[in-house]
């Protein structure tokens, strides 16, 4: 999984050395990536972010699912 190679700096700039690609992340994207790297499931990630943000579980699930799909499109997760 290429996501495990990703290095994120203090400005939320993510870099994947083997591909030579970089991405600008917002705070939520960085948090999701960090949680994925910790081995959290999608459902655990949704729960954590919903609790922190005060948004409904359903709304957060939709956003997290969309982000997971983007990670798949970019080939960062399977």
Question: In which residue ranges do the predicted regions lie?
Answer:
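Long, charge-rich, low-complexity alpha-helical segments
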Residues: 24-78
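Acidic, low-complexity/disordered tracts enriched in E/D and polar residues
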Residues: 1-37
């Amino acid at each position: 999984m290429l996501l495990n190679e990703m290095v994120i700096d203090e400005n939320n700039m993510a870099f994947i050395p083997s591909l030579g690609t970089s991405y600008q992340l917002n705070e939520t994207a960085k948090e999701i990536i960090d949680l994925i790297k910790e081995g959290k499931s999608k459902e655990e990630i949704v729960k954590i972010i919903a609790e922190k943000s005060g948004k409904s579980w359903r709304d957060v699930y939709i956003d997290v699912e969309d982000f997971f799909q983007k990670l798949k499109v970019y080939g960062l997760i399977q």
